[in-house]
Amino acid sequence: MFVQLLTYGLVAASTLQGVFASTKLPILDLPYGRWRAAKYDEAADDGSYGPPCIPGPDAPGFEDPSYKRQQKAAREDCLFLDAYVPGNALRNRGHRKLPVIVWVYGGGYSLGSKDLAIEEGIYDGNSLVQRAAGNAIVITFNYRLSALGWLAGTTMENEGLPNAGLHDQRAVFEWVRDYVHLLGGDRDKVSAWGESAGGGSILSHITANQGIVDPLFKRAVVMSPGLDFPIDRKGSVENQFKAFASRAGCAGQGLACLRAANISQLIEASYKDLGQIGPTPDGRVLKHVFSVDIAQGNYWRHLDSLIISHVYDEGGPFVGNDSTLESLSGFLKSNFPTYATEAVSTLEDYYHLKAPSNESVRAIGSRLIRDAIFTCNIRDILRKYSKKSYLMQYSPKEATHGQDVFALWYSPKLWNVSIPLFSGYQSYFLSHAITGDPNTLRDRDISPPTIAWPKVGDINAEKLENTLDVVDTGYKLISDNQVLKSTCDLWQKLLLDVTKQGGYLDI
């Protein structure tokens, strides 16, 4: 057992093969009630992982036993952090400081935790530290979810804290800035890694505060970044808050009633069609939806290097077997403000939703959701960071959303199986975290062999060149036909038009 003194208390850690794992660091506390900013907690670590945050309902197509366990174990007091530190970092703290990886998990802003599937090695930092040969520190953490983490709207703006989950994440990056040197880490070499909601969160930190506040990381890995487009914060977003309050028995009574409500009331209310959940414009931290902020120049300009990736099939798992052209039109109408009829009609034409076509409904829906929620976010961040970015498509067995997480967190000793493709894949990411370049430390003595990975090609091209395609047989460079310029230009234009139409560009 190792005990480390931080400035606010003692932290205990267990050790596994030279990696000290300090779990359930009580980094943040919620002393003043719900939907407020958290603060550092002074309690000491007790060696357990700590409870996860209260989730929303399972996402269609992603039901999993681990989510059921999360629902049973979850508590409001959930803001804990796990630090995986190689022994050499603690023994040699006066010498070389190590790069730090901070993982932001996905789950649609409604599900997930830092140790959701820890038994299978998912989000277990021991393996990554060992694969990095002790040359990196890994941090994982919880953040508030569902209604408790992402309610927004004008009532929240006036009485509470919109995007509380995003503030929780920011507090962790501040903790890393303030304390990671005591664990042998280098606060100037922090990499933010995230998938799905985690990737969307990282993009939101890049545009937060109109891009004038340091997000506290220099490198980023953004995998399948998921973001909705809740533009109308005074209209549909506020109506979402009112509907939630009504279901919780607090209609017309403001946030004070919700803060006093029994947690079971809030959980039940969040399970009944909560609607869009995730980073939402609040007029303060997030000025606009991500694509609009990028177009307006509201982004942090001083990142050193990024890896951006998507899987072969992002949208497919979100399209039900009973989907119709009408239900896909309903997806657009429910995500855009009610006044955005022209934008919706334009997209209905673009995706052939008004009349049957030769393309199957499932294929249309998959493409629509892919573009709207995932890949056009990739095109948008690359508009500003193409000269510092590496682009990847993860394609083994025509991979669907989330499957690349298993490759990133691959643990050969825990899984009792060797998957060389996953080992090579990991080496790109760890090389990037340690050096800023995925090529420097990539595994060259492995089969299938890794290959040189150049930065992404001309951002003005319809298809992005130099995309590293990860397939069952290895790696190759392709032109990416899923992040199309014409498609994403259309989406960005329409989001700008709708934002302006609602009167939000001048707010």
UniProtKB/Swiss-Prot annotation:
Main location: secreted
Catalytic activity: a triacylglycerol + H2O = a diacylglycerol + a fatty acid + H(+)
Originating species: Arthroderma benhamiae (strain ATCC MYA-4681 / CBS 112371) (Trichophyton mentagrophytes)
EC numbers: 3.1.1.3
Active site: S196 (acyl-ester intermediate)
Record protein name field: Secreted lipase ARB_01498
Keywords: Glycoprotein, Hydrolase, Lipid degradation, Lipid metabolism, Secreted, Signal
Lineage: Eukaryota, Fungi, Dikarya, Ascomycota, Pezizomycotina
Residues in the signal sequence: 1-21
Family: Belongs to the type-B carboxylesterase/lipase family.
Enzyme class per UniProt: hydrolase
Subcellular location: Secreted
Glycosylated sites: N262, N321, N358, N416
GO biological process terms, semicolon-separated: lipid catabolic process
Recorded GO MF terms: triacylglycerol lipase activity
Pfam families hit by this protein: COesterase (PF00135)
One GO CC term, this protein: extracellular region
